[in-house]
Amino acid sequence: KKGGNQQGGSGVAHNWTHDIPVLARGMVLAKNIVFVAGPPDVMDEEETFGRIKARDDSVNEVIAKQQAALDGNQGSVLLAISTETGETLSKYDLGYLPTWDGMAAANGNLFLSTEKGTITCLKGKK
């Protein structure tokens, strides 16, 4: 959604708003790209809440799948998003979960710390 959107009763006009398929654990800005990393978001919360209210027991499978993603059983996703348009420029599947707020960008490199205690350095394109 582009231009002047007001979400959730906020008095702040947004330049753009996009849902992303990631539960953000880390974000970092590098020039005109924001990098977002985290486990995949596999659940539509509004739909799930409606199913819970309707006492639909099949919703438990969806909740379990989202919990498995949060636990790291599905790795994580790294998105590169344009700050100008909100468009996803690229998507990378990572085999590990980043730590909370564990991303940094410097000199064309992106650094991610993981829950396994490692640091990964990704080199940017020129």
Question: Which role does the model predict for each range below?
Answer:
Residues 1-126:
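Extracytoplasmic/lumenal domain signature
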